[in-house]
Amino acid sequence: MAAEGSKPVRIGLLGRGTVGAAFAGLLAERADAVEAATGRRPEITGALTRSEGDFEAILAGSDLVVELMGGTEPAREHVLAALRAGKPVVTANKQLLAQHGDELFAVAREAGVQLRFEAAVAAVIPIVRTIQESFGVTEIAKVFGIVNGTTNFILSEMAATGAGYDQVLARAQELGYAEADPSDDVNGADAAAKMAILARLAFHTPVTLSEVAYEGIEAIQPDDLAYAKELGLSLKLLGVAERRDGGVSVRVFPCFLYPGHPLAPIEGAFNAVMVEAPAISEVTMSGPGAGGL
């Protein structure tokens, strides 16, 4: 029950796919803890899917909106409407932010409401808050890491078992680490969108997905992993954002890492992000990076 005299926080949920359903389950499971911490109990008062639900009714009956639809439309339209209606929005939609971040953040500022997006980058790793708060006045030179758990799982399994790409991808799908259509994960687009967001945060400059050079892991063969193993190297799909030649360079590419590199031991469906800043050297954070949440 909500604390006496308090009202529940009414949440309008946009999207009930893998992530949306996992969020709803986790919220129900931890409702008591949220209430104890905030004094208000979270309550999903309406949910919208691509085929069911009334967006206007959900918006009117909510205090905040959680967008987990994926894709750019109709997610963009709904998020803009929520912000203009004065409703704070939480989103995990990295494609939406990478392609339309300028517009969304501008509308949020004009409306005086928050647009939060921690879950859009590197899953459970609190890298967004770390960059915004811990590095608030510290100049960052470089942000790089493993930001896609699906591809890291595939490369790790190929290296450990000698199995081919298609076989390991099927295994990742069985385990829930890869979508039925894994294209954005394996071709590097998902990681590219996340790196565009991190670059914007780290360097305080707009970076769109079209400005990120990226390639994925579809062409990686078992022989590539065997060769790396012989040399004591690890093969990872890395995202890199750094200051270069007076501007910002952002790219995603498969890369061999030497033994002892902080990212070399990151295996399976895990993410890890490193931040380099002259004033503090470097910080590394890691955590689970694929699946429902």
Predicted regions and their residues:
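ATP-dependent carboxylate/acyl-activation modules
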Residues: 2, 260-293
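N-terminal glycine-/serine-/threonine-rich beta1-alpha1-beta2 phosphate-ribose binding loop
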Residues: 2-87
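Conserved active-site and cofactor/substrate-binding residues in soluble primary-metabolism enzymes
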Residues: 14, 18, 22, 60, ...
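General beta-strand structural signal in soluble alpha/beta enzymes
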Residues: 64-67, 90-92, 115-119, 142-145, ...
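Short glycine-rich anion-binding loops that position phosphate/pyrophosphate groups of nucleotides
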Residues: 70-72, 95, 120, 148, ...
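Rossmann-fold NAD(P)-binding glycine/threonine-rich loop
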Residues: 74-85, 94-132
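Rossmann-like NAD(P)H-binding beta-loop-alpha module
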Residues: 109-112, 116-185, 189-190, 197
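Substrate-binding/catalytic subdomain of NAD(P)-dependent oxidoreductase enzymes
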Residues: 167-265, 270-272
